[in-house]
Amino acid sequence: MTDLKNDRYLRALLRQPVDVTPVWMMRQAGRYLPEYKATRAQAGDFMSLCKNAELACEVTLQPLRRYALDAAILFSDILTIPDAMGLGLYFEAGEGPRFHSPITSHADVVNLPIPDPEQELGYVMNAVRTIRKNLAGEVPLIGFSGSPWTLATYMVEGGSSKAFTVIKKMMFAEPKTLHLLLDKLADSVILYLNAQIRAGAQAVMVFDTWGGALSGRDYKEFSLRYMHKIVDGLQRENEGRRVPVTLFTKGGGQWLEAMAETGCDALGLDWTSDIADARRRVGDKVALQGNMDPSMLYADPARIEQEVASILAGFGQGNGHVFNLGHGIHQDVPPEHAGVFVEAVHRLSRPYHA
């Protein structure tokens, strides 16, 4: 494998010295870029784009051609695992993801297969290998998965949800069924992420998009417990390097201490957390990633720079910060505003690493 020309993202995750704060953006390969829209049109639909290694590679690399980003992230979807379990993923116009066969009973959970990442999810591994080859050591590649809780919400609700009443009914009325489902999902995620690492992912991230819908007690029992199991099961070394793992619970700022106890390397923060407070609480244990409100990219360039400066000052001197948005970039943000953001992070962060 090629040596990395820019490893500051990996170094920052391990709280090692860097020259400037590394930056990437969640959903950096996406609909805000006209070139992405053109490639997606060529693929026909979203899942066809994910399943074509060459096109998935192309959209992964597109933002790197525009911006001096410090990492690439695999172009895929968190719902690849439930799709590979046979739930029949499809996308409803204006509705988002849906499943033809959602989980409705204990028997459904018992019968769920654990997918082989090199078979049913082989298209993801092909994409990882293709991207690594084409990156040619420019920046590291991030692999990812959804968290067991977040995947379960889609599988039990049958798609996106606002109130999570169906899965919460299962959680309170049939907790054993939900625990069995989450356990199977954790095993599947471990296999899936380890396969991504073997295929060439140099860091991995677990997206717990809906953990913030839970009470503190339920978060620990139904979400964090299974992310902890994943962290314990991951291959943490490959190609002679540590493979850092980042956990991100959207709306999880009140649980950072418990999250840091899992043994992960870094925690993602959304914009509702104060990064100075987060560093005081857990900065001795983990790196922090975040945390500008993605909507700030609608602002004028001077305001974007001001916000970047404010977050950098909040984190303060030293290492262990990866700059990112607090969630995915919005699809109607002007691409040049993303460029202002990336450039500002590098330029304004240098004094913090002197």
Curated annotation (Swiss-Prot):
Gene3D superfamilies given in the database record: 3.20.20.210
Keywords per UniProt: Cytoplasm, Decarboxylase, Lyase, Porphyrin biosynthesis
Record carries keyword Lyase: yes
PROSITE patterns: UROD_1 (PS00906), UROD_2 (PS00907)
Record pathway: Porphyrin-containing compound metabolism; protoporphyrin-IX biosynthesis; coproporphyrinogen-III from 5-aminolevulinate: step 4/4
Biological process, per Gene Ontology: protoporphyrinogen IX biosynthetic process from glutamate
Main localisation: cytoplasm
Swiss-Prot/TrEMBL site (Transition state stabilizer) positions: D77
EC number(s) stated in the UniProt entry for this protein: 4.1.1.37
Binding residues annotated for substrate, in chain numbering: R27, Q28, A29, G30, R31, D77, Y154, T209, H327
GO molecular function: uroporphyrinogen decarboxylase activity
Transmembrane segments: none
Entry GO terms, CC: cytosol
Pfam families per the UniProt record, alphabetical: URO-D
SUPFAM superfamilies, per the entry: UROD/MetE-like (SSF51726)
Subcellular location: Cytoplasm
Annotated catalysed reactions: uroporphyrinogen III + 4 H(+) = coproporphyrinogen III + 4 CO2
Subunit organization: Homodimer.
UniProt cross-references to NCBIfam families, sorted A to Z: hemE (TIGR01464)
Family affiliation: Belongs to the uroporphyrinogen decarboxylase family.
Job of this protein: Catalyzes the decarboxylation of four acetate groups of uroporphyrinogen-III to yield coproporphyrinogen-III.
Name of the protein described by the UniProt record: Uroporphyrinogen decarboxylase
Organism: Pectobacterium carotovorum subsp. carotovorum (strain PC1)
Gene name linked to the record: hemE
